[in-house]
Structures are given as structure tokens and as C-alpha cells.
Design a protein with these regions (language model features):
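Short, Lys/Arg-rich, polar N-terminal cytosolic tail immediately upstream
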Residues: 1-14
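Juxtamembrane helix-loop-helix connectors linking adjacent transmembrane helices
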Residues: 2-5, 39-54, 75-144, 151-152, ...
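Hydrophobic core of alpha-helical transmembrane segments in multi-pass integral membrane proteins
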Residues: 24-33, 60-70, 98-109, 263-278
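Functionally important transmembrane alpha-helices
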Residues: 33, 37, 186-248
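Small-polar-interrupted transmembrane alpha-helices in polytopic inner-membrane proteins
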Residues: 102-107, 135, 139, 160-176, ...
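Membrane-interface helix caps and helix-loop-helix hairpins in membrane proteins
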Residues: 114-121, 176-185
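Membrane-interface helix/loop boundary segments of multi-pass membrane proteins
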Residues: 141-166, 170, 201-211
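C-terminal membrane module of polytopic membrane proteins
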Residues: 221-283
Length: 283
């Protein structure tokens, strides 16, 4: 029975593929909940909040890696390389892109969109720890799950084009929150699929999730941790830039600038670069 279930290469209707993908997402949720519980327990002993933030990040990564790697090796009986989870070093090009992309988006808003810049200098060490943790945890866990595990499963059952799109759509859907209008959701789906395809393209470019881990992690570090750009002043980031604009293509709607047009254009440019790198590598 189990041998039939894990025979992912022989999945006529795709049911097994979907179930394995759902299992991966469940393991991700379990890891995060467990990390939060452990961190909460430790907060009764450790009073320094910045340490708790870093510990929660480390636990999230550790628990998820243990669960997903255990399931891949013992459950699916596959090697990690099969899912592009390997020790290939991140490309210097994509390391550079990971820095240029968020800096260009931040620069666009600062130089071309009117707003008010402020420094959240209260508990700066906590904000820096938050920036590091949100970059590391999302970069490592989400990329191994979506661009490593799920993308390969979908690729086996269907093809690479669908594999690049489907995890990206799921990735976008998981970011939908309450209070969003239809326009907000559509805009989030457009940008979410674009950023997901970008991470997928970056992974395919050198056949490793390590590139997308770097691009995703550095993006979160700068956009969500260091510089909070939104209509209202962001107190969680180190720097806050409150923009004065009602244009949803600039503000990104309720989700924020990650679903705005400037960021989406950036995703598109990186996708083209990744495709070119892939083409040159295979030529």
C-alpha cells in the first residue's frame, strides 16, 4: 500500500502528487507551531526578546528541515538531490541580484514617490534580529518547501512549466489574509505568481534551491525587516517610509509594495535573467 502511495512517477490522475504536496505544507505548519510553542516556553526563562526572536527562527528552520528531510528519505525514499536540495554554492550573479532587486524597489519609492522617512530607533537590536529572522526562516523553509519539494513533485507528474506555476499560485494563495478586497486578492495573485515564478526560474537556472533561498531571504531582509514602505508608518521595520499615494499599483493595496507594480516589474526582469542563465548553461 505504502509502496504504491510513494510511487510518484506512476500517478495517472495526480492525486498522490497533491497529497504529498499537502503533507509537505502540513509539516511546514507543524514545524512553525512547534517552534512558536518552544520559543514561548523559553521566553519564561530568557527575558531578552531579541534572543527569543532568533531562537524562534532557528527552531522553525531546524524543525522543518528535520520533518521534511525525514519524510523525503524515509517516507518517499528519495535522496535530497532529487528535490534540488543540495550543496551547490549560490551563484555570484544571483547573490548580486538578491541585493540589487530590493535596493532598486526601495530606491524607486524613495526617489520618485513622495513620503516621510523615519527611523524606528526604539529597540533597534530587536528590529535587526527580526529582519535577520524573517529573511532566514522564509528564505530557507519556504524555498525548500515550494521550490524544492513541491515543484519537483509537480514537475514529475506534469512538466516544468506547470511546476513553476502551480507552487507559485499556492504560494500566493497562502499569503491571502482577511480584510482584502477582490482587487487586493487579484493584485496579490498576479504579484504572488510573478514572484513565485521568479524563485522557480532562479532555482532552475542552476538546478539548486540555494539560489532562490538567497534571493528570497535577502528580499525579506530588506523589504520586510530593514525598510518598511507603506501608506502608514511601519513600526516593525528599522526604517519606515510612509508614502503619500492612493494608487494601488504603487501602494500594492492591502498586501503592500510586494504586490505593487515596481516590485512586479523587478520580478519580471529577474525571471528573464534566470531564463538566459539557464539557456546559456544548457547551450
Amino acid at each position: 500500500m505504502w509502496n504504491t502511495f510513494i510511487a510518484i512517477e506512476n500517478d495517472r490522475f495526480g492525486f498522490k502528487t497533491v497529497l504529498h504536496c499537502v503533507i509537505g505544507i502540513i509539516l511546514f505548519i507543524i514545524a512553525n507551531i512547534t517552534a512558536a510553542i518552544v520559543s514561548k516556553a523559553l521566553s519564561n526563562i530568557i527575558s531578552v526578546n531579541s534572543i527569543i526572536i532568533i531562537l524562534n527562527c532557528c527552531f522553525s528552520i531546524l524543525f522543518f528541515l528535520l520533518l521534511i528531510l525525514l519524510y523525503i528519505r524515509k517516507g518517499l525514499r528519495k535522496q535530497l538531490d532529487f528535490f534540488r536540495i543540495n550543496n551547490i554554492k549560490p551563484s555570484k550573479l544571483f547573490i548580486l541580484i538578491s541585493i540589487i532587486l530590493p535596493c532598486c524597489v526601495i530606491g524607486f519609492y524613495y526617489f520618485f514617490i513622495n513620503g516621510t522617512l523615519s527611523v524606528n530607533n526604539i529597540k533597534m537590536h530587536e528590529k535587526l534580529c527580526f529582519a535577520i529572522s524573517i529573511g532566514l526562516s522564509a528564505g530557507v523553509c519556504e524555498e525548500i518547501l515550494f521550490r524544492g519539494y513541491i515543484m519537483k513533485l509537480v514537475e514529475i507528474r506534469w512538466n516544468r512549466k506547470i511546476a513553476a506555476f502551480v507552487p507559485s499560485a499556492v504560494f500566493a494563495l497562502l499569503h491571502i489574509s482577511g480584510g482584502m478586497s477582490i482587487i487586493d486578492i487579484l493584485q496579490l495573485l498576479l504579484a504572488g505568481i510573478a514572484v513565485g515564478v521568479m524563485f522557480s526560474s532562479v532555482t532552475y537556472a542552476s538546478d539548486t534551491v540555494n539560489n532562490s533561498i538567497v534571493v528570497h531571504g535577502v528580499w525579506n531582509f530588506f523589504i520586510l525587516g530593514i525598510t518598511g514602505i507603506s501608506v502608514k508608518s511601519d513600526s516593525t521595520a528599522l526604517l519606515a517610509y510612509a508614502i503619500r499615494s492612493d494608487n494601488i499599483w504603487i501602494t500594492g493595496g492591502n498586501f503592500g509594495i510586494e504586490s505593487g507594480l515596481p516590485a512586479t516589474i523587478g520580478y519580471g526582469i529577474v525571471i528573464l535573467l534566470a531564463v538566459l542563465v539557464k539557456y546559456k548553461r544548457e547551450k
